[in-house]
Structure formats: structure tokens, C-alpha cells
Amino acid sequence: MAEKIKVPAGVYDMVTRCMEQEFPDNVAIRYVAEDGKTVVEKHYREYARDIRKMVTYLKNEVPDLKGRSVVLLSRNCYEFCVASYGIILAGGVLVTLNQKKTWDELEYELGQVEPALILNDGVDYGCRAQLEAAYGPLLRPMNCYKDSTPGELTNCVDHDGLMMLMFTSGTTGRSKGVMLSERNMCSTLVTYSEVAENWITNRLPAGQKLPLSHMTLLPLFHMACFVCVMSYPPAGWALNLCGDIRDFYRDLGLMHSDVMASAPMLVETIYNDYKRGRVERLNGLWDLCCSSAALDPKMLEELAANGFVVNQCYGMTETFGDGILNFTQTADHMSAVGKPDDHCEYKLDETGEICIRGNSVMLGYYKDPKATAEVIDKDGWFHTGDLGRIDEDGYYYITGRKKNLMILANGENVSPEELEHKLAACPAVQECIVKEKSQKICAVVYCAEERQAEVKDFITECNRTLPLYKRISAVEFTAEPLPRNALGKLLRKEGRNLDAAKIKQL
């Protein structure tokens, strides 16, 4: 039986107890230095000391910081983690932004939060000139704290107040600032601590020693990665940072990792390595955690049968990453997102939409009470926008997005995700999106030009298995991959408006 992980009461407890008292000599963060060869290890003792330095720096720079926003605009790095804790413990509101967005998007988000400071890595991602022109006096380097003195910490965090803002990906329009509290974080930490205990008790390979190390290529500005920054100190585990997908195999080879949070496309890459007999490239990686999109259950089953542990999860920024987890390694439930945790309530409403109620649910959308009221009802249920079903064993399955439903002239509702899943079974289809066009169902397909006839034949056969109202009546072939966001999610609005290379009426 694994020793129970003591969940911290908040961010202050995380630093002063978990980092400084319980695990000071454990490695907290690893990364590969600029020479591309040297692995830098930061232990929890040094991590906590740097957090204290950041608190000192911020209080000196902005004496009236309480309740004001400090923005992080940077690739994955150790200083990002230090700043995240430092901003909160200095009384500020942590804001993490995607540094690779267009200036129009960044200008909007920065205008929303009105930052007191912007900590950034100095890299030009395409709009450096505009950033300096608009916010030059507020810009600071990520390591701005390095010459400061470690200061005293006080527990200044309002447990139910605004602790951080994280913007949604905005796949269908302007992004929204999700307001999150320390209570939201702690609710999620309860779940993640139980996940860690489950790993230790039921998933650990023979001979595997603790503490574990977790590789992340996901961006720290995204909740799927950020939640690891907050959930690993209570267990004393390490986070191995990779800042660029081009360095993934180099970094994985230099830093042994047990677990990896991954976008679906990277899981497929790892599967291909396994199929080609190149498992040595993975350097002992054995646990894959995936969210954001459905994966082929046959692929997951094969990975699980050959020594990998595969965990799927369903969480949202609006719930601090908390949600539904799937630890099963058997084929009958591999396509499910899992079962709900025990710390929130879950249900399907009358339309089949997944709803969540509990301490992990956000405070609301920043400066947008109308949008908040649209997703959190009077009884406190957060309406996720995802449609689902529950099987007889209590497993949840995602069937589509409510806002993506196509309403046809005959009144029938059709889920594009259902048809996309069927099209994905065609070997020639690399990517696809289904849309409504002139009251007909149309598929946009990315594939090799010489395989377009194969796709057409597949759709013809597929249509024979579908009711008339669900049949695909047009296909567009595009020469370019479909647009996706930083986490690999399909951008449907842009995908629907692609200029197709060819249009074939079936």
C-alpha cells in the first residue's frame, strides 16, 4: 500500500512544507542547457529559494501588487515555474499567455488583464516590435529575480478569490479568461494525489523506484501542463521540461522520464516507434497520459499489451484540469475517457451535455458575466459543451461538441465528430473535418492526391451503413494539413473555411 500523499492546504503550504520540509533534496525540475548536452537539475530546496527571491523582486518592483495581474509570456523553462509560484505568493494574479499567438490576439488578452508587469523570454515569436512598443516599460526577463534576496513568505492568498487567469484556446472565436482560485487548485490536487497513489500501488513496473519523473512537451501556459507544476510537489516528483518538439528525442534521451503528458499526435509517434522496434529512443518511458482528442482504441490496446500504461483524461481549464480519468488497460473500455473522480458531481443533462459541479469549477469568465451565466446555471452546474454517453459500467464517452452539431433542413441533428471518427478508419485519410455546406454534409479531407479515389470509394461504402440524413454527399480534398492550436486541437472555424484544392461531388 502506497503512503498517502498529504494534499497541501494551498500554495503557501506547497512551498513551505512540501518543498522546504518534506522533499528538499528531491529533484524538482530538469531541463537541458543551451549547449544541448548538459542536464540541469533544480532540487526543491533551490526551487523554493528562487520562489522566495521572486516574491522579493515583485514586491519591490510593484509595492501595490495585491490583486494585480502579472503576465508570463515564455516558452517552457524553469523560470516559468518559479514565477508561477512567486506571483501568487507576492499577492498578484498569475496570467499565463500563449506567446505564439498573433499580435491581434495578444493585444486583446493583454488589454483585458491590464498587467502590472510582463515577464518574458525575449524571443521574437512574430510580434516582438508591437509588444515592446505597447508595453516596453513593463517587460522584464524571466530570470529577473536572480539577484534578489530570498524573502519571508506570508500566506496572503484568498482561498476563494482570484488566484490566476488562463485563457481558453478560443477555437471558435475570441478567447475567454478563465478565473481560477486556490480552492479550485486544491480540489484538483486531491484528485491528482489519488492518481499518484494509484500509480504507485497498481501501475509501477517491477524494479521501478520512486520518485517518478514526468516529461512534458505540452506548453506551460496550458492547463494540461500547468497542473503538473502544481500537483508534483506534494509527491516530491520531478518535472522534466522540453521547450521545443524538435528537441523531444534529444531531451528524452538525456532525461529519463517515467511518465509523459502528451498531445494525441505525439502518442501516435511513440506508437510508431514501438512498431518499428525503436523503443530504445524512449529511454524507459512507460506511462502515457493523453487528453484533448480521442485515440484509436486498438493502438492503445496494443501499447498496453506491450508494457506501456496508457491513461486518458478529460479535464478543462474551467475545472483546473480536474475531470474524468481512464486507467483501464483492457480493450472493452479503451475508447472511453474514463470514470468521474469522487470529488465533484457529474451528470448528463437532457441534451446529453456533460455537466460538472464542485470545488474545481472556475469562478467564471473574466469581465464576462454573460458568458459565465451561459455555462454555469443557477444550481452551480458547469455545462462543458461536450456531449457524451455513459455505459452500463459507468464509463463516460465523448460523442461530440454541442456547438458543433449540424442542424439540417429536415430538422435532424448530426454530430460531425461521429462521421469524422468513421472517416479516420480509412487508411488513406490523414486528417478530416466534417461540415454542413448548402444543407448537405461535406467532408474536408487531407490526403495524398493519388489516394483521393480510395477515399471516395471508402465514403461510398461508409454511406451504405448510415441513415440517409447522415450520409456524406460531398468531399473536398485539401493539399494542406488542417489547422490546429498549440495542443493539437482542430480549429474547426478555420478548417471549415479552407480553400479546397479540389471538390468532388459524390
Show which residues each predicted segment covers:
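N-lobe entry segment of adenylate-forming
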Residues: 1-61, 66, 85, 111, ...
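Conserved pre-ATP/AMP-binding loop-to-beta segment of ANL
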Residues: 24-27, 149-167, 173-174, 203-213
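Conserved AMP-binding A3 loop
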Residues: 41-45, 163-190
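AMP-binding/adenylate-forming catalytic core of the ANL superfamily
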Residues: 118, 358, 363-364, 387-470, ...
